[in-house]
Each structure stands twice: as structure tokens, then as C-alpha cells.
């Protein structure tokens, strides 16, 4: 009961901050954020703030999770690549809104925790997980209709752009980390030409691996 009340409260909070997509709000209300927060911080799971999860990583602020998800413009039919599974919270949100989610985490310990939460506790069947360098993407599963990057890269990783399907969209924080970055939407036209739009300033941990 506590989990659901916390999630419902978060959904109302992000709605008050401007999130409008009913499906995104419903997903925020349904996913128990405390499941993805370290036990010592679970009393803060209902706060709209990023929290440390170890290994220099964080579980993102719920508003940012909702904003990024909303900007993917999901209809329920998409195959989504997530770069940076982290705690698995964003992955669980995506799983409720997309047909398939392919998520990559470079830190083995975090990947194992996320796997337990997503596959063993929540029993999500449309999620595939991999441990490795997310900046390289998941070539054998490409192309993807959507790509979501949950760590800041100095530039948009070219491998991810290459794996984005025509008509697809990527949402990625771009800029130096630590520090202030910009959340960028990259739309790939049916002609293969990319159009970039800067959305909001954000603060993310740095992308590690070849593009970090």
C-alpha cells in the first residue's frame, strides 16, 4: 500500500509540473519507485529528486524521467533502446509504454540489481537486458524506433544515431559532466537526415565507455 501511495503521489507531482501525457502519468503511478531505491533511502523514494544508487550513479528525478519519457512520443508499438539501465526505474516506466525495451548497463553490479527488480520482482516480459558499453548500442537488435540515453555524453554517440530507425527519435543529455547539460531530441527523417532540438537544461552523471 505504501508503494502505490508513493507512486500515485509522484504522478500527481509531475502532472503539477507540466507532464500531460495520461499514459506517462499512469506509468509513474503504477511503478513502485521504492523498489529501485537503496533500502537506506527508501523513505525518500517519494521525493522528486535524484538519489544515489552506488558506483557513482543515481536514480533520476521523477520529473526528469517523466519528461524524457513524454518526449519520446510513445504509442505502445515501439522498440526502444535504453542506454544506462541504472536502477531499472526508467526501464520499468518504458516497459509499460512500449512494445519492447532493450536496456544496457555498463556496471555489472547495477545490472544484476536491475535484472532482479525488473525480471524477478515485476516479471516484465518485454524487457531485454545486457551488460556492456551502451554507447555502442545493440547492433544485432537494431534498428530502434526510439533511443533513450540516461547519462550525459559530450556529443550524441554516432553508433546510436546509426541504430535509430528512419522516423525515429532519440532523447539524450549532451554536454560535459559533472555540470549542466542540455537534453536534446534527435529526430531521424525518413530521408535519413537528423534534426536536433534542445529541450531543457539537465544534470546527469557522465556516460561511461567509449563515448564517455
Curated annotation (Swiss-Prot):
Q: Return the GO cellular component terms, semicolon-separated.
A: cytoplasm
Q: List where in the cell it is found.
A: Cytoplasm
Q: EC no.?
A: 2.1.1.77
Cited InterPro entries = PCMT, SAM-dependent_MTases_sf
Q: Which domain of life is it from?
A: Bacteria
Q: Which residues form a coiled coil?
A: none
The entry sums up its family as follows:
Belongs to the methyltransferase superfamily. L-isoaspartyl/D-aspartyl protein methyltransferase family.
Q: Per its database record, what is this protein's job? A: Catalyzes the methyl esterification of L-isoaspartyl residues in peptides and proteins that result from spontaneous decomposition of normal L-aspartyl and L-asparaginyl residues. It plays a role in the repair and/or degradation of damaged proteins.
* Protein name per its UniProtKB record: Protein-L-isoaspartate O-methyltransferase 1
